[in-house]
From Swiss-Prot:
Signal sequence residues: none
Organism, as annotated: Escherichia coli (strain K12)
MF terms in GO: DNA binding; RNA polymerase binding
Coiled-coil spans in chain: none
Identification of the protein by name: Regulator of nucleoside diphosphate kinase
A biological-process GO annotation: regulation of DNA-templated transcription elongation
Function: May act as an anti-Gre factor. Regulates the level of the nucleoside diphosphate kinase Ndk.
């Protein structure tokens, strides 16, 4: 099954690479999935990031097309995760799936246990790059 093109900024990619090298994450299946996403991603500088792309620290509204549920979450690094009702770790399967997608994109993504989900990005309520916050 083909996946939509994803765009990741160089700073996010570097930080995720460092995260994935940590022993706590290196052996996890999600680490392999994130590495594969980084390998296929188009890279750009934070300043060149299109304003409709889900980046780290973006607040994204998305729909689970499997059950129709709509959620709004801020995509964060695990160390910044404080509230699962408002945040989503990039090391969570859904967080990894959303990274780099554009508004309007949808993706099929495998969850733990072999279950698949189908997600659609509806809106970016905040993107650091669009706000000029290039170092978040």
């Amino acid at each position: 099954m083909s996946r939509p093109t994803i765009i990741i900024n160089d700073l996010d990619a570097e930080r995720i690479d460092i995260l994935l090298e940590q022993p706590a994450y290196a052996g996890l299946p999600i680490a392999d999935a994130l590495n594969a996403e980084l390998d296929r991603a188009q890279m750009c500088s934070p300043e060149e990031m299109p304003h409709d792309v889900v980046t780290m620290n973006s607040r994204v509204k998305f729909r689970n097309l499997s059950d129709g549920e709509v959620r709004v979450r801020t995509l964060v690094y695990p160390a910044k995760m404080t509230d699962s009702n408002t945040q989503l770790s990039v090391m969570a399967p859904v967080g990894a799936a959303l990274l780099g997608l554009r508004v309007g994109d949808s993706i099929h993504w495998e969850l733990p246990g072999g279950v698949a989900t189908h997600l659609e990005v509806l809106e970016l309520e905040y993107q650091p790059e669009a706000a000029g916050d290039y170092l978040l």
